[in-house]
């Protein structure tokens, strides 16, 4: 079996299209502090996790055309065909205790692959909360990310750095919002353990989890504010734009109608950006209609909220 970090046929061309499609789902994607990501050595990325598969897609945008390997919960690998596609996408399965001891035991094979990635200077991205949470308040960070980093450092004998990343969604569920991605200063695992020499291992991991969560929360930042003035001019613009909105609604019917049907059948609305991405991925010729359709929809929604 080919190593997951190795170049494989079709990946880079597909990655360019994937990154372009991701950008079409948002009004803007602003990246700050990308220069803080080490360009060599063993690097583990630690973003907050808000929006299912959209979060890894935004990480790919952050890295441009460079390869990144991801960790994800093992239950989505149950179907062999899906597992094959996920591996092609450079995603590794990581089992949790709730999956049972037999599944957790398989993590050792995954850990070997992660360490192999780090040894070959391919970044590994792990969402340390363990699951997504469509809120600005993060869930508690799990210690697994630090265990992996410590294991890699012990086996490779090189510094392993964990990079905090904060992803700020203007809207967790609606399209064409603004995205802010901020990268923090790396945490070198050896230095972090040295600072806490004398503490029990459990206390070290507890402090590290708290610190990573605090760093990510600081990077996420506050909720983006918007203007509420010029109501008359905005109302006039809304009225004049209605013919364009109607054309765009009809033109993008094959995107927004399946999207609405799919999302109504899903309990977990955090998948909304992922489903929207899938529709854009399948129907690129309809971007010209769907992008202005969603932007106008947001414009009308904000206007109605301000006029109440």
At which residue positions do the language-model features occur?
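Soluble catalytic domains of membrane acyltransferases
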Residues: 4-199, 257-308
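Long, hydrophobic, amphipathic alpha-helical segments used as structural scaffolds
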Residues: 220-223, 251, 258
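Long, charge-rich alpha-helical interaction segments
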Residues: 196-231
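Phosphate/oxyanion-binding loops and surfaces in catalytic or ligand/nucleic-acid-binding neighborhoods
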Residues: 92, 186-190, 215, 219-222, ...
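Transmembrane alpha-helical segments and their cytosolic interface motifs
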Residues: 232-254
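Compositionally biased, charge-rich terminal segments
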Residues: 1-9, 55, 222-239
């Amino acid at each position: 079996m080919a190593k997951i970090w190795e170049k494989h046929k079709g990946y880079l061309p597909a990655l360019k299209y994937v990154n372009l499609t991701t950008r079409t789902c948002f009004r803007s994607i602003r990246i700050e502090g990308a220069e803080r990501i080490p360009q060599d050595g063993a690097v583990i990325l630690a973003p907050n996790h808000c929006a299912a598969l959209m979060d890894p897609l935004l990480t790919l945008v952050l890295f441009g055309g460079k390869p990144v390997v991801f960790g994800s919960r093992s239950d989505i690998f149950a179907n062999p065909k899906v597992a094959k596609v996920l591996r092609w996408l450079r995603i590794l399965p990581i089992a949790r205790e709730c999956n049972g001891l037999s599944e957790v035991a398989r993590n050792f094979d995954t850990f070997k692959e992660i360490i192999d990635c780090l040894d070959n200077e391919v970044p590994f991205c792990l969402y340390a909360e363990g699951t997504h949470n469509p809120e600005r308040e993060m869930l508690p960070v799990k210690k697994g990310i630090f265990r992996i980093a410590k294991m890699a450092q012990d086996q490779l004998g090189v510094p392993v750095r964990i990079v905090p990343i904060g992803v700020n969604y203007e809207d967790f569920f609606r399209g064409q919002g603004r995205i802010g991605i901020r990268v923090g200063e790396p945490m070198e695992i050896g230095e972090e353990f040295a600072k806490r020499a004398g503490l029990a291992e459990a206390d070290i991991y507890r402090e590290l989890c708290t610190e990573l969560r605090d760093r990510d929360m600081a990077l996420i930042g506050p909720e983006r504010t918007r203007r509420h003035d010029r109501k008359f001019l905005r109302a006039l613009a809304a009225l004049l734009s209605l013919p364009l909105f109607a054309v765009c609604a009809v033109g993008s019917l094959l995107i927004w109608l399946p999207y609405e049907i799919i999302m109504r059948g899903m309990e977990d609305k955090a998948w909304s950006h992922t489903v929207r991405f899938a529709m854009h991925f399948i129907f690129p010729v309809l971007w010209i209609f769907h992008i202005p359709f969603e932007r106008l929809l947001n414009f009308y929604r904000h206007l109605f909220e301000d006029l109440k």
